[in-house]
Amino acid sequence: MKEIFIPKECEWRFEVDEPAIQIRLVSGNAEYFGTELALGPPYHFTRVKGAIYTWQGCTLEVEGEPSVEYVAEETPMSTYLNLHFALEGLRLQAENAAANDESSYGPCVCLIGPRSCGKTSVLKILESYALKQSRHPICVNLDPTQPMLALPGSISAFHNATILDIQDADGFGASTSTGPTHVLAKVPLVYNFGLDSPLDNPKLYKLSLSRLALAVHSRMSQSKDARVSGCLVDTSSIQENAEKYQDILHSIITDFRINIIIVLGSERLYSSMKRKYADATWLSVVKVSSSGGCIDREEEWIQQFQARCIKQYFYGDDRMPLSPLSMIVDSTQLVVYRVLEASESGPKSSVLPLGFEEENTQSEKQDGNTSLRLHGKGEFLERISTEAMTILQNSILAVSSVGEDEDEATVVDSCIIGYVFVSDVDDVKNRMTLLSPVPEQLPSNALIMGTCKWQE
């Protein structure tokens, strides 16, 4: 165990893999991405790249050895604090106007930038600072590779009312589960995109985010607190030269009614946004410096992060162990869809919703040595036949909120209520072994397969 003194307005940056390290605040005050640390109790961190900042100076007790650690004197925290005060000013304006006009909204902020520029960290800081002033902005995550209160391949939103759980895998906290939580559980709204990148199927991605945006603004219209507090939208990494992503970004801005764009880590992107929205008087584009602690996330680290999120979803962690239910189901009773990439989409029909073909059409696709008979192939989904269920081995399946009798268009339009893991498939007996976080039968037999795989 060692003690680390952090001077005022400095931060201690660290990287840790395994085993976990334990950090305790001994004196002073400190915060982890905006969330204030309590004096005394230990905090456990594993497989994270983090930073603890102090405004007045503090002393930490650290047990364990981070792979990288140093104290940084130059940080952008003052800029982030000023940004928070600017957003709070807009919330006060909306609050004052709300007395006479219920349509007055607080700031709807979109954070954009290239890979590993610190967008999610800034969102956590702004969310935590807002909570300290009794504001509760809706948090939105549109990055399917870095889930928020969900599993990889999903986009989600939640109306936060409590502090973030900094020890959780994603740094936000836990959604409702079968066990107790140290911090009040969050209740997210989740849509399954199912693919790694928005560019894998831009039309499906834009459809999913439009449904999520509709729900967010429905919540804001019904709650004065949410309406005045506004929303914070985190996006996936921008590929500056990808024209399709610029189209996606425009959909995000219009669907979520964004009035502030925060650009991190790219002068070129900032100039592009300023030029593109020069005539949009309702939209402000703000350039903010990335922290010097931002580190490129290697593909291996992203995969480990996703695996940790999946494991925690089913088995919990050291603070809250969970026991998932292993169930054997009749695969003939399930309706399983596979999410299509744009290059795989079937021809669009002008008379059927969302581009789906007639149910009696069939297409065959070769996947290695397995012949897949996939029914009703459409623009976004294709139904997997019982004979082809072996491809589900080790897959994470999203459980749709609609029943198996609904058509594919309704499934695409609907949110999901959870996930199951396919641990075994017996194509001879038409049986499938599923791991479920809930000790009861599946609430819906309509399941969706994306690209997410996991090895227990």
Swiss-Prot record:
State the compartments where it is located. Answer: Nucleus; Cytoplasm
Reply yes or no: does the keyword Nucleotide-binding apply.
yes
- GO BP: any one term: co-transcriptional mRNA 3'-end processing, cleavage and polyadenylation pathway
Q: Which residues form a coiled coil?
A: none
In which domain of life is the source organism classified? Eukaryota
Under the heading Pfam families, the entry gives: Clp1 (PF06807), CLP1_N (PF16573), CLP1_P (PF16575)
Q: Name one GO cellular component term.
A: nucleus
Q: What is its main location?
A: nucleus
Gene Ontology MF: a single term = ATP binding
Residues that coordinate or bind ATP: E11, K49, S116, C117, G118, K119, T120, S121
Q: Which InterPro entries match?
A: Clp1 (IPR028606), Clp1/Grc3 (IPR045116), Clp1_C (IPR010655), Clp1_C_sf (IPR038238), Clp1_N (IPR032324), Clp1_N_sf (IPR038239), CLP1_P (IPR032319), P-loop_NTPase (IPR027417)
> Is Nucleotidyltransferase tagged as a keyword?
no
**Keywords recorded for this protein, A-Z:** ATP-binding, Cytoplasm, mRNA processing, Nucleotide-binding, Nucleus
Free-text function comment from the UniProt entry:
Required for endonucleolytic cleavage during polyadenylation-dependent pre-mRNA 3'-end formation.
Describe the protein's quaternary organization and the partners it interacts with. Answer: Component of a pre-mRNA cleavage factor complex. Interacts directly with PCF11.
Stated family:
Belongs to the Clp1 family. Clp1 subfamily.
Sorted alphabetically, which HAMAP family does this protein's record hold? Clp1 (MF_03035)
Protein known as: mRNA cleavage and polyadenylation factor clp1
Species source reads Schizosaccharomyces pombe (strain 972 / ATCC 24843) (Fission yeast)
Q: What is the lineage of its organism?
A: Eukaryota, Fungi, Dikarya, Ascomycota, Taphrinomycotina
